[in-house]
Structures are given as C-alpha cells and as structure tokens.
Amino acid sequence: MMQPKRTKFRKQFKGRIHGNSKGGTDLNFGAFGLKAVEPERVTARQIEAARRAITRHMKRAGRVWIRIFPDLPVTSKPTEVRMGKGKGSVDYWACRVAPGRVMFELDGVPEDVAREALRLGAAKLPIKTRFIQRIAE
C-alpha cells in the first residue's frame, strides 16, 4: 500500500475539503480516466483495491496511472479507551479528494475494456465518479 516515506510531522489535523479541485482535473497521461464527482477521503487500502480491480480486468494489458497519493495520516484511539490523554496513534493513510480530481488514468486498451475496468475500480471507492475520455484530435 502507498504511504509517504517520511513526513515533517507524524500527525495532522482532520481538515475539510472545500470547493472543487484546484489542479489535476485533466487527463495528462492516458486516454481514459476516472474523475471524482464529490468530495471524500480515500484510504490507501481503497486506492490499492481499485488498482487491483482495474489491472485484473485489463489482464495486464495497457498502462495504469494513479493520480492521487495518500499523504494524510489518520489517527484513532484503541477501543474502550477514555477520552483525553492525547491524540491516538496513526491508524492508516488517506488522501483528500476534491470534486473534479482525476484519480486514475488508463491507456493501451479499447474504450469498452477501459470503461468496464474503471467501473469495477470505482465500485471499490467510497465516492461518486465519472468516466472521462481524451477528445480525439
């Protein structure tokens, strides 16, 4: 699973996702993509599950680019522990995804295969998505 090699600080604030994505809204690498429609926090496990579903349907043909990275440490306290006594330890890593953000890109496969692969990948994500395609020039 993806996580940063090192960070400046071990723990971060929860934060909010305001407005639309400032960058990463266009296809830069592949011909097809999966774009977020609503704001949500996506975990490293969910990104990995989506990646596996996509590559499995493509039967290792073509290429997949993951355009999001889980750089947000999410903490949690153990069960049945009273409130207080500091912030909990890092439980998992997540990524804040704003609406309009391209999360996955594909290339080297036909459109019907790409559409189905991204549909299977989107089922693993806790977020509404849209299939996008590069306009032929």
Swiss-Prot record:
GO biological process terms, semicolon-separated: translation
UniProt entry keywords in alphabetical sequence: Ribonucleoprotein, Ribosomal protein, RNA-binding, rRNA-binding, tRNA-binding
A GO molecular-function descriptor: rRNA binding
InterPro entries, alphabetized: Ribosomal_uL16, Ribosomal_uL16_bact-type, Ribosomal_uL16_CS, Ribosomal_uL16_dom, Ribosomal_uL16_sf
SUPFAM superfamilies referenced in this protein's UniProt entry, alphabetically: Ribosomal protein L16p/L10e
Annotated GO CC locations: cytosolic large ribosomal subunit
Family: Belongs to the universal ribosomal protein uL16 family.
Function of the protein: Binds 23S rRNA and is also seen to make contacts with the A and possibly P site tRNAs.
Record's subunit section: Part of the 50S ribosomal subunit.
Record protein name field: Large ribosomal subunit protein uL16
Organism field: Brucella anthropi (strain ATCC 49188 / DSM 6882 / CCUG 24695 / JCM 21032 / LMG 3331 / NBRC 15819 / NCTC 12168 / Alc 37) (Ochrobactrum anthropi)
Primary gene name: rplP
